[in-house]
Amino acid sequence: MSIELDLQIACENENGLPSEKDLMTWLNAVIPQFQPQAELTIRIVDEKESHELNHEYRGKDKPTNVLSFPFEAPPGLELDLLGDLIICRQVVEEEAIEQNKPLLAHWAHMVVHGSLHLLGYDHIEDDEAEEMESLETELMQGMGFEDPYIAEK
C-alpha cells in the first residue's frame, strides 16, 4: 500500500498551510480503503488560479475550495494515477471562519472530499450526496475530527 503525492505550492504565502505529512495522513485515511496504490497531485493555489480553472472547467465565475480532475486512462492502460486536486488556500481559510471550524479540520475535509471525487464519488444527485457526505463524515471522524456537516444538520 503506497501513495505517491506530488505536492505543488502555487500561492504567494505558504504560512499556515498544512504540511506534506498532514496531507499524507489524510490521503492514507481515504485512498487505501479503495485501492492499494495511488499517485496524485495536490496543488495549493491562490484565488486567481482557482477562479480561472473554475470558470474554464465548471463555468463558475468565482474561486472554489477544491477542484478534482480525475485521470482517465486510455482503454487497455492500467495506471495507479488518480488525478489532480486543486485547493484554493483563501477559500478554505474563509470557509473555515464562516463555518466556525478549525482550519486544519477544514483542510482535511477538502482533501477527503476531493479524494473521493478522484475515486469516482459525486454529489450531483441527492442520493449520491447523501452517500458521499456519510462517507466523508465517517472518514473525518475516524481521524479524530468532527462531522464536517454538523452545522447543516
Curated annotation (Swiss-Prot):
Pfam families, per database record: YbeY
Enzyme type, top EC level: hydrolase
GO CC annotation: cytoplasm
SUPFAM superfamilies: Metalloproteases ('zincins'), catalytic domain (SSF55486)
GO molecular function, one term: metalloendopeptidase activity
Gene Ontology annotations of biological process type: rRNA processing
Keywords of this entry: Cytoplasm, Endonuclease, Hydrolase, Metal-binding, Nuclease, Ribosome biogenesis, rRNA processing, Zinc
UniProt EC number: 3.1.-.-
Binding site for Zn(2+): H113, H117, H123
Role of this protein: Single strand-specific metallo-endoribonuclease involved in late-stage 70S ribosome quality control and in maturation of the 3' terminus of the 16S rRNA.
Entry similarity comment: Belongs to the endoribonuclease YbeY family.
Name listed for the protein in its UniProt record: Endoribonuclease YbeY
Species of origin: Aliivibrio fischeri (strain MJ11) (Vibrio fischeri)
